[in-house]
Structure formats: structure tokens, C-alpha cells
């Protein structure tokens, strides 16, 4: 597999992972709202907003590059538990950082590399702060 093709395949995989991440935070935010914890729900909704933004940016960039994208209908929400959400979320965010760091940059065009770096920066903030609103509109 060529370097460019490998990089695009990894971004397609990252797109599916971002979809899963949105489902993860959406479920947790709903649980927090049901538990009456408005502050936690807001925090989780901030993370959800960032992950949705990552998904949108990856989708848009891949489509701009002419990539035919697989549907995301089959991506399922992972199991969630509000009681230990921070530990699970931090590990999931670490996985996202590792995923984006592993994408070979040398074969990416400048704009795609910029999008990747912006997402990676937000994911690094998520690991340390577990809060959202790190993405620029």
C-alpha cells in the first residue's frame, strides 16, 4: 500500500472512531441529564461538540480529496457508565491521540495535514482536561 493510500485509510478509520466517540459522549451526556447533573451534562456536551466537529472536518476533507466514504450506520455506541466515565473517556482520548499520531504525515497534502494537526491538538487537550470547546469554528 502506498504511503498516501495508507494515510487516507487511517483517516477513514479515524472518521469511524470519531463517530463512535460522538455516540460515547452523547450517551454519557444523556445519562448526566437524566441524573440531574447539569454541570456534568454541559461538560460532556462540550466534548460531544468537539468530537462531532472532528467527524465533520474529517468527512469534509476526505470528500474534498475524492475519497468514497463508507457509511457510518453500523458504528455502535460503546458501553458507558457515568460512575467511571472519566477513566474510560481519558483512555479513549489517549487512543485517539495515538491514532492521529500514527498517520504518516509525509504523504498528506498540506491542507489535510493542517486538519489532522488541529484535531490532534484538540484531542491532546481532551486527554488533559476532559472538557470540550477546543475546536475553532
What are these regions (language model features)?
Residues 1-137:
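Non-heme di-metal
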Amino acid at each position: 500500500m502506498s504511503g498516501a493510500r495508507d494515510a487516507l485509510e487511517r483517516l477513514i478509520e479515524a472518521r469511524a472512531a470519531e463517530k463512535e466517540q460522538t455516540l460515547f459522549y452523547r450517551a454519557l451526556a444523556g445519562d448526566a441529564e437524566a441524573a440531574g447533573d447539569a454541570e456534568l451534562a454541559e461538560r460532556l456536551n462540550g466534548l460531544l461538540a468537539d468530537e462531532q466537529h472532528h467527524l465533520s472536518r474529517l468527512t469534509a476533507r476526505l470528500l474534498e480529496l475524492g475519497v468514497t466514504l463508507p457509511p457510518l450506520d453500523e458504528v455502535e455506541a460503546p458501553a458507558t457508565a457515568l460512575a467511571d466515565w472519566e477513566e474510560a473517556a481519558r483512555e479513549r482520548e489517549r487512543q485517539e491521540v495515538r491514532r492521529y499520531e500514527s498517520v504518516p504525515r509525509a504523504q498528506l497534502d498540506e491542507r489535510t495535514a493542517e486538519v489532522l494537526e488541529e484535531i490532534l491538538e484538540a484531542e491532546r487537550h481532551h486527554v488533559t482536561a476532559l472538557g470540550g470547546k477546543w475546536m475553532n469554528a
